[in-house]
Amino acid sequence: MDRLSQILWRERELLELLAYKLEVERLVLASGRTRWLVNATREIEVLLEDLRATEVLRATAADEAAEQLGLTPNPSLAALAEAAEEPWRGILLDHRDALVGVAREIAETSEDAKGLITAGYRSARETLLAIGGTSTASYSAAGAAVADAPRSHLLDRSL
């Protein structure tokens, strides 16, 4: 159980850091300074790799704890807590509550960032349509180049 608790602490730390990195990415998107977006995204990808490795360790430790408690493999954290005696019951429930809270925070921040990305895409598309014509398509379904009809432009020569 001690090993499982230590791994859960590590997972909580990584998830808190992920929440922070996602917030930074959201702020970069909101500011429009997309120059830093690649760096923010790279940091998140590295952190996600660490999280995946920690999840494997947690699953292994949870299976070991389940075996000690007479549970089937791949138990939920709530099931482990229910089967465990104090103080482990309280410790595991605290971990569960903290993990649920940070997961909720991550989901909300991700939705905000997704909204900003969608708005940015829409804005860029509208700008391209205003500059280049009625379509953003470059090629037809058959592979032929699509070109808009030439547009006449007004030019003020009095300047």
Positions of the model-derived regions?
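Extended, charge-rich alpha-helical scaffolding segments
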Residues: 1-79
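Short terminal interaction segments
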Residues: 76-159
